[in-house]
Amino acid sequence: MNLTTQISNELKQLSGFSSSTPRHIEMTDSDGLVLGVAVVAVDALSCAFESLTLHVPSLVGNESGALQAWADALSGRVTYLLENIGPIEIDQRSNQVLIRSTPPDRTSTGTQFYEVLLSAQTNGTFLLRRYRAESGQPGRKSVDIHLTHETLHKLVSDLVDTIPQPATE
């Protein structure tokens, strides 16, 4: 069963769930991709979650070029969040790419932004979180991401569809 179908089934089972402590759900597809979502609320149309991870075993040990290709493909395709996203930093030593909202959402009280970390270390990971930085306060706080079920399905599909394919020899 693909990840989109699995997440749909999980959301149906969690309908009505709401908690300050996230419920971690995890799904695996036939290609070994592992999707994890830290859910804090689900209703009939939408959900809120702290983070979304996708472990991609085929990316383990890949050079930053594959991650850069994934970052570019994601940034071009995922245009339906509150802000557009784009790669802002490539760390070739640690094989990581940082993607953020471009530009972030700025208000008089602070700034909110999405942050995605792509990593080819240990288990090849995509990690999505949203942060808020208060004006005049140091640091940032993680805030929940709110999406309709349909938007979450599209995001999961786009993540899977843009994974770089290993080079064939």
Residue ranges and their predicted role:
Residues 68, 86-93:
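Phosphate/adenylate-binding glycine loop and adjacent helical scaffold
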Residues 93-106:
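Short, hydrophobic/proline-enriched secondary-structure or compact coil segments at domain edges
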